[in-house]
């Protein structure tokens, strides 16, 4: 689906979550059939939201009896057995709002269409939201099929087709719910508990303001009351791990929880504890596999440039006598889709005793891991990357010394900005030579997935793969601009402003086409086309959906309809969302061999 901000329909409704506590909702009529189910459902919804449902002009004595039987025990429920009067709109409401009712539901027989119209126009004048059953022309809002978590986690899922089929909307809703993990209630409850605990412990002085103008609504964390309002383009903001300011230190747990929510396997979120953060982020707290001895982590750009002392890892003490040694493989899992996982990688995943996975490995790949296989997800987040890497290496070394088969599962390809070479040397230095299985690198796969021919005659005759983040967060060496080259930048979108400024200063053409490809090969893949000079502005506008790459060059638009890429100041980008080209049944695939 291609989304162009200029041609989006202007009549789509604005979907919000409205608060109804203590509000008065007027239900006029109860339907023209023997069934009163629609009215009952609405009363249930109003009561569950904390509102006061008042039924005026019930359609029949039978309806009145049914409603009294079911809702008469609720103090907030009321039935007014008389004909509706227009004055009810301004006399049955709360004193706080001058007796004006807060919301109106109309379900009258077709013979009273004239009255429906009168009620609608009066509600319009009084700015009262109104819904008239099966009459969109007399409605200012619609009720949406909604699933409410019966375990009380607070999770609600609503779907609307905007008049294109209520039954279809319900089916889509059921399909979404069926794909949720069985422990979704526990996941939501646990994440809410951790969020509240962090707020209480780290932000006591600001708590009275209840999120507003507090650090919890800072860009990139997404903990405010408005769930669509967080600035996700700053979600992976560069944090120099060993040079954090006091402010960054104070927000460390907040940042950790944000990353856990975004990247960690959904069904594992119910088991996350704050103690996991304390263990992974504190240099003074050692895990079971971590003590101070001579085994050290290989030097990296980050700890060399920051001039910090390397944290040391232990070799687990070996028992005397012959002992079975473990095996390790560094496995590339590709960009995200199961269809782009190699047979060799799949075999390693299925035969591992323990899997050490990057946080960016998508859920679809993690779901292939057998339930009994121990899985350890790297606890990396901005400001904790180095310590998390050392923890992961220590875990791998301990498992190897215990004779286990270890699979180090990496996103993309291990040797394309994946620290695979460093990890190879680390395990080799400790007596274990890894088997390395290549994976399809996102740097090349994402061009195909975005309909970008990285090379094409008369358009692009070379490809360059670069990082957008050099040592200590500095810009990498800026390559020269070559008109016939397709350049792919990894780890660049979180600092697009700095990178693009550097490119333009070094002579790059600001009008060259650019594409932001995010979550390539995943169902929520997003491809955004624009011009190089507008990339920072576009990233800020659309937010972040990591992981992502930036592709620059004329090849970006080689296969795209020209009318989609006629950009100007009023139309700076176009978005193409979704990826459903391939579906692979892994179990059936294994039966073939």
Curated annotation (Swiss-Prot):
Residues 278-303 are annotated as: Disordered. It holds the Pfam family TP_methylase. Gene3D superfamilies: Cobalt-precorrin-4 Transmethylase, Domain 1, Methyltransferase, Cobalt-precorrin-4 Transmethylase, Domain 2, NAD(P)-binding Rossmann-like Domain. InterPro entries: 4pyrrol_Mease (IPR000878), 4pyrrol_Methylase_sf (IPR035996), 4pyrrole_Mease_sub1 (IPR014777), 4pyrrole_Mease_sub2 (IPR014776), CobA/CysG_C (IPR006366), Met1_fungi (IPR012066), Siro_Cobalamin_biosynth (IPR050161), Uropor_MeTrfase_CS (IPR003043). One of its GO terms (cellular component) is nucleus. CDD domains: SUMT. GO terms for biological process: methionine biosynthetic process; methylation; siroheme biosynthetic process; sulfate assimilation. Its EC number is 2.1.1.107. Belongs to the precorrin methyltransferase family. This is Uroporphyrinogen-III C-methyltransferase. It comes from Saccharomyces cerevisiae (strain ATCC 204508 / S288c).
């Amino acid at each position: 689906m291609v989304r162009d901000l200029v041609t989006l329909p202007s009549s789509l409704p604005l979907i919000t979550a409205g608060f109804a506590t203590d509000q008065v909702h007027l239900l006029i009529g109860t339907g023209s059939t023997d069934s009163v189910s629609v009215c009952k459902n609405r009363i249930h919804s109003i009561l569950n939201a904390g509102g006061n449902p008042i039924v005026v002009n019930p359609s029949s004595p039978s309806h009145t009896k049914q409603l009294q039987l079911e809702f008469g025990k609720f103090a907030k429920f009321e039935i007014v057995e008389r004909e509706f009067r227009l004055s009810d709109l301004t006399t049955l409401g709360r004193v706080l709002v001058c007796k004006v009712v807060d919301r109106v539901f109309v379900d009258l027989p077709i013979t009273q269409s004239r009255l429906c119209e009168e009620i609608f126009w009066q509600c319009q004048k009084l700015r009262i939201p109104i819904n008239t059953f099966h009459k969109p022309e007399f409605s200012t809002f619609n009720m949406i099929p909604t699933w409410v978590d019966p375990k009380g986690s607070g999770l609600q899922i609503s779907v609307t087709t905007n008049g294109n089929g209520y039954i279809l909307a319900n089916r889509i809703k059921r399909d979404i719910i069926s794909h949720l993990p069985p422990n979704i209630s526990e996941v939501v409850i646990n994440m809410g508990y951790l969020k509240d605990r962090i707020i209480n412990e780290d932000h006591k002085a600001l708590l009275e303001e209840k999120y507003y103008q507090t650090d919890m609504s800072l860009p990139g964390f997404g903990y405010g009351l408005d769930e669509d309002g967080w600035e996700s383009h700053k979600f992976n903001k560069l944090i120099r791990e060993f040079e954090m300011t006091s402010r960054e230190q104070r927000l460390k747990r907040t940042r950790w929880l944000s990353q856990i929510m975004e990247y960690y396997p959904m069904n594992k979120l119910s088991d996350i504890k704050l103690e996991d953060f304390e263990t992974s982020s504190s240099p003074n707290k050692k895990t079971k596999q971590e003590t101070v001895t001579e085994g050290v982590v290989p030097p990296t750009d980050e700890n060399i440039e920051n001039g910090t002392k390397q944290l040391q890892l232990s070799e687990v003490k070996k028992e005397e006598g012959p002992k079975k040694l473990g095996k390790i493989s560094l496995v590339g899992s590709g960009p995200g889709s199961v269809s782009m996982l190699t047979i060799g990688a799949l075999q390693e995943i299925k035969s591992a005793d323990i899997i050490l996975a990057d946080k960016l490995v998508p859920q679809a790949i993690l779901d292939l891991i057998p339930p009994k296989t121990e899985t350890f997800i790297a606890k990396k987040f901005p400001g904790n990357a180095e310590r998390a890497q050392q923890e992961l290496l220590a875990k791998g070394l301990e498992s190897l010394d215990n004779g286990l088969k270890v699979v180090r599962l990496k996103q993309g390809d291990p040797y394309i900005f994946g620290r695979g070479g460093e990890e190879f040397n680390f395990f080799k230095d400790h007596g274990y030579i890894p088997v390395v299985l290549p994976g399809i690198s996102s740097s090349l796969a994402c061009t195909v997935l975005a309909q970008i021919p990285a090379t094409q005659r008369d358009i692009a005759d070379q490809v360059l793969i670069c990082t957008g983040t050099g040592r200590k967060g500095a810009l990498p060496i800026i390559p020269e601009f070559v008109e016939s080259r397709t350049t792919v930048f990894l780890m660049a979108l979180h600092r697009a402003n700095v990178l693009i400024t550097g490119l333009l200063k070094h002579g790059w053409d600001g009008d060259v086409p650019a594409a932001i490809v995010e979550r390539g090969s995943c169902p929520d893949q997003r491809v955004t086309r624009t011009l190089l000079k507008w990339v920072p502005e576009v990233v800020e506008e659309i937010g972040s959906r990591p992981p992502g790459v930036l592709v620059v060059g004329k090849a970006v638009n080689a296969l795209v309809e020209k009318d989609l890429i006629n950009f100007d100041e009023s139309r700076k980008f176009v978005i193409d969302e979704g990826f459903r080209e391939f579906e692979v049944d892994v179990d059936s695939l294994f039966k073939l061999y």
